[in-house]
């Protein structure tokens, strides 16, 4: 199969997270045909692939087969899983995020091993069907298995869609950490007609939120963007009635933080605000990921060089955006770069990619393989 055929076949699989829906069969067949050792790791409903070929210095290609829901299919030009190719544009859910990049990786590997029978290093693949969802049974668990085996991964290229206007104009070498916080403010349930006696936790929560919004969490940008806070939800324990006040209110918050913050620092700031108002409260913090950052190394140099050659531009290193599976891979590899297709239609109606972009990305990946596994 050529790169377009692989991409089309992957897009046709309705792999809503965490279901693989047949993507792995396509990928495994391609890998076996190249002589890769392939191991399937299934955790719960999630299907993962760990595969490699060669020995020594290891470059990992990482990605995911799962996709988000297509939404209202009436808003699509073509059915979201029909994999429609029209005028050089390939439509379909997951085309940009990130089945197109997976096809580019596979063809880049095929061309590389056709040219170099015995490279100096090892190429590995880690593919999961649980990246868009919770991520609990995906890359995270595979990495834990690899750590127990004492596997070594020297550098990792993740095919997340990073491009804004052109392939390679943006690459990422780090991400902020993610922390979710639930604050529970307690009051006293009462009849709404007796407002003067109300200990209403909604009013208490308003004061707390006001303080949170005024708080400086971290004004230092350092090597990653500033720490930010977003309030995700406010809900009371009253669901149906309209004549009673609630006894508690939950405030749900998410923080994206850089190396100048951490779970302990953020929690201490919140607690100091809660103590100031002397309300009864509980606070629960869930750390989803710590920040990570790749310093200059052979992978970043190779990525920049390849983009300059094939795109005639110098990529910008911008580490904004959400989390990626790099948060798990960082435990085993300190060189992680994200480089993929354009992100302007990801998770949207009519997600699509240009075939010419697929070919460019494949050439870039192939050049990186040569630089890392031949000239390293």
Curated annotation (Swiss-Prot):
<comment type="similarity">
    <text>Belongs to the peptidase M20A family. DapE subfamily.</text>
</comment>
<dbReference type="GO" id="GO:0009089">
    <property type="term" value="P:lysine biosynthetic process via diaminopimelate"/>
</dbReference>
<keyword id="KW-0862">Zinc</keyword>
<feature type="binding site">
    <location>
        <position position="64"/>
    </location>
    <ligand>
        <name>Zn(2+) 1</name>
    </ligand>
</feature>
<feature type="binding site">
    <location>
        <position position="97"/>
    </location>
    <ligand>
        <name>Zn(2+) 1</name>
    </ligand>
</feature>
<dbReference type="GO" id="GO:0050897">
    <property type="term" value="F:cobalt ion binding"/>
</dbReference>
<keyword id="KW-0479">Metal-binding</keyword>
<dbReference type="GO" id="GO:0019877">
    <property type="term" value="P:diaminopimelate biosynthetic process"/>
</dbReference>
<protein>
    <recommendedName>
        <fullName>Succinyl-diaminopimelate desuccinylase</fullName>
        <ecNumber>3.5.1.18</ecNumber>
    </recommendedName>
</protein>
<keyword id="KW-0170">Cobalt</keyword>
<keyword id="KW-0378">Hydrolase</keyword>
<dbReference type="GO" id="GO:0006526">
    <property type="term" value="P:L-arginine biosynthetic process"/>
</dbReference>
<dbReference type="GO" id="GO:0008270">
    <property type="term" value="F:zinc ion binding"/>
</dbReference>
<comment type="function">
    <text>Catalyzes the hydrolysis of N-succinyl-L,L-diaminopimelic acid (SDAP), forming succinate and LL-2,6-diaminopimelate (DAP), an intermediate involved in the bacterial biosynthesis of lysine and meso-diaminopimelic acid, an essential component of bacterial cell walls.</text>
</comment>
<keyword id="KW-0028">Amino-acid biosynthesis</keyword>
<comment type="subunit">
    <text>Homodimer.</text>
</comment>
<dbReference type="Pfam" id="PF01546">
    <property type="entry name" value="Peptidase_M20"/>
</dbReference>
<dbReference type="InterPro" id="IPR001261">
    <property type="entry name" value="ArgE/DapE_CS"/>
</dbReference>
<dbReference type="InterPro" id="IPR002933">
    <property type="entry name" value="Peptidase_M20"/>
</dbReference>
<feature type="active site">
    <location>
        <position position="66"/>
    </location>
</feature>
<comment type="pathway">
    <text>Amino-acid biosynthesis; L-lysine biosynthesis via DAP pathway; LL-2,6-diaminopimelate from (S)-tetrahydrodipicolinate (succinylase route): step 3/3.</text>
</comment>
<feature type="binding site">
    <location>
        <position position="97"/>
    </location>
    <ligand>
        <name>Zn(2+) 2</name>
    </ligand>
</feature>
<feature type="binding site">
    <location>
        <position position="347"/>
    </location>
    <ligand>
        <name>Zn(2+) 2</name>
    </ligand>
</feature>
<feature type="binding site">
    <location>
        <position position="132"/>
    </location>
    <ligand>
        <name>Zn(2+) 2</name>
    </ligand>
</feature>
<keyword id="KW-0220">Diaminopimelate biosynthesis</keyword>
<dbReference type="InterPro" id="IPR011650">
    <property type="entry name" value="Peptidase_M20_dimer"/>
</dbReference>
<dbReference type="InterPro" id="IPR005941">
    <property type="entry name" value="DapE_proteobac"/>
</dbReference>
<feature type="active site" description="Proton acceptor">
    <location>
        <position position="131"/>
    </location>
</feature>
<dbReference type="InterPro" id="IPR050072">
    <property type="entry name" value="Peptidase_M20A"/>
</dbReference>
<dbReference type="Pfam" id="PF07687">
    <property type="entry name" value="M20_dimer"/>
</dbReference>
<dbReference type="GO" id="GO:0009014">
    <property type="term" value="F:succinyl-diaminopimelate desuccinylase activity"/>
</dbReference>
<keyword id="KW-0457">Lysine biosynthesis</keyword>
<dbReference type="GO" id="GO:0008777">
    <property type="term" value="F:acetylornithine deacetylase activity"/>
</dbReference>
<dbReference type="InterPro" id="IPR036264">
    <property type="entry name" value="Bact_exopeptidase_dim_dom"/>
</dbReference>
<feature type="binding site">
    <location>
        <position position="160"/>
    </location>
    <ligand>
        <name>Zn(2+) 1</name>
    </ligand>
</feature>
